[in-house]
Amino acid sequence: MSYSRFLTVIVAYALSVMTALAAPPESLRTWFVDSLIKVFPADAPGTHRLVTPEFWCARNQQVSVQLAVRSVAPVPGMTVEVPPLEMRSGGKIADVRVRRVGYVIVGSHTPDTPPEELVGEAPGWYPDPLLDFPLDLEARRTHAVWVTVRVPAEARAGIYRGAIHLRAGNRLVASAPFRLRVAAATVPEQRSLKVTNWFGLDDKVSRQFYGVPAFSEEWWTLVENVARVMADHRQNVILTPLMELIQPRVVGSEIRYDFANFDRWVETFKRAGAIGYIEGGHLLGRGGESYEGSLEIPTFQLAGGQIRKESLPADDPRVEQFLASFLGALNAHLEEKGWKSIYFQHILDEAHGPEPPYYKKFAEVVHRYLPGIPTMDAVDAAHMPEELQENCDIWVPQLGRFDDQMDLLRRRIDSGHEVWFYTCLVPNGRYLNRLLDYPLLKVRLLHWVNFRHNLVGFLHWGGNYWTPEPMKDTQPVINANTTLLPAGDAFIMYPDRANKSVLSSIRFEAMREGIEDYELLRLLKTKNPAEANRLAEAAIVSFTEYVRDPVAFRKLQRELLEALAK
């Protein structure tokens, strides 16, 4: 290429950039969209536009405000700011966080689900992770600004006015005013709904996604940051990997246990506000990475003065010898720390087929060596053999498997036992779930199910079980590469390597708001049980019939807040 031709190309490129930076404000469109509606890149200007951008909330609640943005010309380096919201009489809300909604790839739709229960097109780009600004806004590609307003518990009730300001460099390109109506009702600080999203931060995960080894000081910083995100989303039950945290030591001719890492883990989550409860990891697993694999129990074995970690068959007599020592030491330590009252113990996830007798056997071991500690596990309410009914203390049945078993669950609840529920890769169809190609209202309503049916906890297995590139691959393969998971099932958070933390998602935000709804419904039940039940029954008619229209849901939300304010 000649020098003159090269210079021409460079000048043309510079002019194009300057033109983009100088794009007139009228080329950029903004409109508010209910935060329960997903904004897609192909959305035309005005899609799902809120006519009146006024948002209701309680005190001590986090409120999501979503603004869609689209431009006919690129806008590089876009930033957003939201000044403190103010009342005309002088009240102010200053705790405001601004993020942008990123897009991830969904390769295929959730199977066995009617088209009307899905959103978006697969394969395609779906909104989910919440990322920091700036944003290089491409031409004719819609993005969403996500504003989180944290309303103080002491905020005055009334209308607060705010605005979202969009800038390209130092130039203001758009402003979008909105109102926040704070009701005279307060989300309780006490977190009564027990909530767990299983997650892992073992050495493999921490090295792969964060570049730090487990138990290094950088790793403990990561753990603390993750704990804060968990607490911020009202997660209060923390899966605790016993075999990784509790370290065996040779003392004389015996194995003794060092609880220093276990203690630091628990205390880190307690300090962040995420414990709550300690959820002891499963004692039994399955071999071959298969759901039908034979049962195996990881143990520590002493041979030749050396400790090795060894998985043994369930019938091996060394298993109970190990558990007697390990659980006995754990029990003594929990008593010493005063943590027995906040501890649950898993035995085996989803015991099925020939496994329930083994569940009974090892539940008896747990009850013997951890006296007073409840066992809890995911179970199939449609198939509850006696071994599970009598030996699993806290039942966690799967949504979609207990429609016809509510009498069984009510009897269990009436007898004084806790019953939770869980979702995973199923249910699908017309049920609620937190999958990427499902509407966000399905996520929020999960915790209305908790209230509606007196189910006091919620469990999901997929907090952060990431693929190697979670932004590009949202569907891991499990069961020895035989099962493709639905999009979003395996994780609801994303790795944040730069900050040694995790990124939230719009699904995680909707989940928190559903948990806040649960607490408000529970509060209303102490004041007006008939109204609390009416609202819950209007929202959740059955497990497959529930409010699907965000406008109708917002009406119920307002009625809830107004009832509490009386």
Describe the function of each predicted region.
Residues 24-49, 72-147:
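Surface-exposed binding patches on compact interaction domains or structured appendages
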Residues 413-444:
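Active-site clefts of carbohydrate-active enzymes
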Residues 7-18:
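Bacterial N-terminal signal peptides
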Residues 119, 126, 131-135, 149-150, ...:
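Aromatic-lined carbohydrate-binding surfaces of glycoside hydrolases
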Residues 307, 311-359, 364-381, 471-566:
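Catalytic domains of carbohydrate-active enzymes that cleave complex glycans
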Residues 438-491:
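Substrate-binding cleft of secreted/luminal carbohydrate-active enzymes
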Residues 72, 150-157:
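Short, surface-exposed loop/turn segments at beta-strand-coil junctions that are enriched for proline
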Residues 49, 60-66, 143-144, 156-163:
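Short, solvent-exposed loop/turn segments enriched in Ser/Thr/Gly
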